[in-house]
Amino acid sequence: FEVPADLRELYGRYDVEAIARRVRNFRYAEEWTTMLLGGWIATIPEVPVKTGLGKIVWECAQSADVLGRRLPELRCGRRAIEASQAANDGFASFIQEVADPETPDLTIEKIAGVFEVLKPHLLAVYERTMRETDQICDAPTIELLEDVVRRTRKHIAWGEEVLDRLCD
């Protein structure tokens, strides 16, 4: 009986503290995405967009929840479950700018900000983290991010389709 070789690499770019910070940052982004999309549902007049956003809000909340549950496993303590944090002041300001369009006539701007700017940025950061973190020691984070990435890709595709239809 031979055990197949594990071809993953030990050691990565991020130590436990760095990956915990990143997970806190990712949770912040998913929480804010959940809140701003949820808040927009009432202001968007197009019913198909409202119903699509409802599912995306739920999936973003699921992502925020699973990322939050990972934090105590990264030795952040029990209180870490309640903590999320912007990567920096610039990202917090960016989120506020994305959240800014509130009136019903700004559906295109709302969708473009989230699905053509924010979500693609998050996707790139999630994928880079998965590539550069320790493939063995941080396998649980990678596994969680694989699900978040899958959902994020689906969200981006939905947003592109909605924008194509709204801009025709």
Predicted regions and their residues:
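Preference for long, well-ordered alpha-helical segments
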Residues: 122-168
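Hydrophobic stripe of amphipathic alpha-helices that form coiled-coil interfaces
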Residues: 44, 67, 74, 159-162, ...
